[in-house]
Amino acid sequence: MQQKLITFAVPCYNSAAYMRHCIETLLSAGEQAEIILVDDGSVKDETPVICDEYAAKYPTIVKAIHQENGGHGEGVNQGIRNATGLYYKVVDSDDWLDTDALQKVLARLHTLVTRGTAPDLMICNYVYEHTEDGTSHTVRYTNIFPQERLFTWMHVGHFRPDQNLLMHSVMYRTEVLRKCGMVLPKHTFYVDNIFVYQPLPFVKTMYYMDLDLYRYFIGRADQSVNESVMVKRVDQQLRVTRHMIDCQDLDALKGEKKLRAYMLHYLSMMMAVSDIFLLLDGSAEAKEKQKGLWQYLREHTSAAVYRSIRFGFGGVTNLPFPKGDAIVVGGYRIARKIFKFN
């Protein structure tokens, strides 16, 4: 039996209202794809039934896995454990893929695999779909990556603060995810950052297509990236940030300057996001948590890594003078209006 080109993992938790749209877009890949629907202990709706329905209807494509509730990360872990595809992509059940772009990506991957030049990481654009005002905007990487050719870290350009590789933009080779030993924490939101970050040192070759593949739904009141929800769940953001501080030794990457620079950029962004939502909380307890996070970074990284983050982008959100917090929050509000990232 020929190996599937790609495994799509779809963690589902009480997703009956919208998961069908997601699944139907993935089915457009046909027999090239394996679709793993992970029912994460859903009890409030027909999610388990829908998973089984698709598995019965498309037995050579769809697998349904039912697990005790473990959170989004455990859904991703479950997908990796069971994946048989050469590549692995996570698609959240309220998001979807553009079917035309998907056909082009899969055709290119098939060509690269046939030639023996399959990359460790395939990158595409993603699109924020804002339901509250019907607008959308695309995050693309044309200023960072060469297009339509295999490249390495030495060919990577500069990331702007509003640009990061997110789960939405990446397809990893499944063996890369297994080789890096990544296990996402259970019952924790925002683990998609770990999913992108931890495997990066194991990526030697990449390929970028300037296609708007992933459609990222923004607008549900209970969504994990909703601002008020993020403030309430800030402890989970801190847990993920600490995990990322610990999971890779950036000083071991000095021979890969651009890889190390990007991972410093990503970790700086995580520190900045944590700072902002602790500032939005505004309590004395949150202020202590902010101090504790920076102390954790100091104690668990080298002086060089700490300085790079503290006096770089990560430190912009931790201004040591009166009204510094107000300036940071004001800057966040302006950026949110411009980039509409949540």
Please report, for each region that a protein language model flagged, where it lies by residue.
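A conserved acidic beta->alpha catalytic loop
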Residues: 39-50
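Donor-binding/catalytic cores of nucleotide-activated saccharide
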Residues: 72, 95-206, 214, 218-230
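Glycine-rich, basic loop-to-helix element that forms the pyrophosphate-binding segment
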Residues: 67-83
